[in-house]
A protein has these predicted regions:
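Single conserved hydrophobic/aromatic residue that forms the stacking wall/gate
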Residues: 1-8, 12
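Short coil/turn segments at beta-strand junctions that form active-site/ligand-binding loops
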Residues: 6, 48, 152, 247
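Short beta-strand segments
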Residues: 10, 53-54, 78-83, 157-159, ...
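Short glycine-rich anion-binding loops that position phosphate/pyrophosphate groups of nucleotides
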Residues: 13-14, 57, 161, 256-257
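Thiamine diphosphate
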Residues: 14-86, 141-142
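N-terminal cationic-hydrophobic initiation segments that often serve targeting/anchoring roles
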Residues: 40-42, 71, 148, 239-243
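Glycine-rich ThDP/TPP pyrophosphate-binding loop and its adjacent helix/strand module
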Residues: 62, 66-77, 82, 86-228
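ATP/nucleoside-binding phosphotransfer catalytic cores, i.e., glycine-rich phosphate-binding loops
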Residues: 217-285
Length: 285
């Protein structure tokens, strides 16, 4: 059984490595630096299966430089972004993936267009790119399995509910939360328990998912006729869905003949961490 090495780079993803502790090794890296850790580990031992967990505040901002080079180098790993369009630590500040037309829960306008990470991943050379919704298990689980089995850089953008800071009618990424204010010195937050939101709809169709506050999340699933090996078509479909105010989900792009970083660098078949010092540094002779 192939082991899994998991690196999570956000304080809110700190539990992620624990989910894979059966025949796996996991640790947390500095925020925005998960790709560096994964690259070093993967180059030292290519026999492991590498899974990295990130967020939109990480991969689209402080860690965007590392995300860019991790994708273009075709590191053999699965890179997951848990995307909710907001920063929790700064109480609902827009992240770079928040849509231009989306207002904050305080009524503030978003002044900048969003960064679409799947489009960027395709343009950078990622050989497997997909987007899904955390409430659509039937679609998400197969995509995760396919990403983990793909040779090369696999990227998954997963629209993930924020239960606290992005659940209001003017948000395009609305989620279940309630916040109560009072005039006392302390202003406690109250997050009620709610029923998990799931959906199931056919390929090639779209659906509006009602959220707990009455707002709607519009999803569109790729059809059977869609060709995921066409890079230009993939980017065009993503942009068209953005224009229509929809979130395109499914396998957006895949290169079945892609080379990974080890092939590009012509690294030895024997893992570097199993070599002797004389093999790693043979000297000038």
């Amino acid at each position: 059984t192939q082991q899994v090495s998991s690196a999570a780079s956000d304080v809110y993803k700190r539990q992620a490595p624990a989910y894979f502790l059966n025949q796996s090794h996991g640790f947390n890296s500095v925020h925005g630096r998960m790709p560096s850790i994964a690259t070093g580990a993967a180059m030292a031992n290519h026999d492991l299966l590498y899974l990295g967990i990130s967020g939109d505040g990480d991969s689209a901002s402080i860690g965007i430089g590392q995300f860019v080079h991790c994708a273009r180098r075709q590191l053999n790993m699965t890179y997951i972004v848990e995307n909710n369009g907001t920063y929790g630590l700064t109480k609902g500040q827009f992240s770079a993936t928040n849509d231009l037309e989306s207002k904050s829960k305080y009524g503030d306008d978003n002044l900048f267009p969003s960064i679409d990470l799947p489009s960027m991943a395709i343009q950078l050379g990622a050989s497997f790119v997909a987007r899904s919704f955390s409430g659509d298990k039937d679609q998400l689980v197969p995509l995760l399995k396919a990403a983990l089995s793909h040779k090369g850089f696999s990227f998954l953008d997963i629209i993930s509910p924020c239960v606290t800071f992005n659940n209001h009618n003017t948000s395009t990424k609305s989620y279940d939360y309630i916040r109560e204010h009072n005039d006392s010195l302390s202003k406690p937050d109250f997050v009620p328990s709610g029923k998990e939101i799931t959906t199931d709809y056919p390929k090639g169709s779209s659906v509006e998912v009602p959220l707990h506050d009455g707002s709607l999340l519009s999803l569109e699933k790729l059809s059977e006729k869609y060709d995921p090996t066409n890079k230009i078509t993939a980017i065009q479909n993503i942009q068209e869905s953005q224009r229509d105010g929809k979130v395109l989900t499914g396998l957006l792009y895949v290169d079945p003949d892609a080379k990974d970083l080890r092939d590009i660098l012509n690294v030895s078949d024997k893992p570097l961490n199993e070599m002797e010092q004389t093999d790693l540094c043979p000297g000038s002779e």
